Amino acid sequence: MANIKSAKKRAKQTVVRNARNVAQRSMLRTAVKKVIKALDANDAAGAEAAFAVAQPILDRFSARGLIHKNKAARHKSRLNDRIKALKAA
C-alpha cells in the first residue's frame, strides 16, 4: 500500500480508469459481435444497422487510445467487406 499522498491518489485513479476501460472495451466487443451475429444469420439489413452503431464506437475508442487506430480500421474494413459480400450474394 502506498504511503505518499500522490501515490495513493494515483492508485485510486488507476482503479477508476481500469474499470472504465473494461466497461468500454466490453461495449466495443458487444457492438462488433452484434454485426458478426447478423452476418452469420445472413441478415444484411440487420448487419448494416449494427455496423452503423459499431463504426462510431470503433472510431471513438481508437481516438481515445483504448484500441490502436489500425485495429479499428481493420475491424471496420473486414466487417464492411463481409456486409458487401452478403449483399452481393
UniProtKB/Swiss-Prot annotation:
Any Pfam family the entry gives: Ribosomal_S20p
Keyword GTP-binding set for record: no
GO cellular component: cytosol; small ribosomal subunit
Entry keywords, A to Z: Ribonucleoprotein, Ribosomal protein, RNA-binding, rRNA-binding
Residue ranges that the Swiss-Prot or TrEMBL entry lists as coiled coil: none
Claim: Lipid biosynthesis is one of the keywords in the record: no
Annotated protein name in UniProt: Small ribosomal subunit protein bS20
Organism: Stenotrophomonas maltophilia (strain K279a)
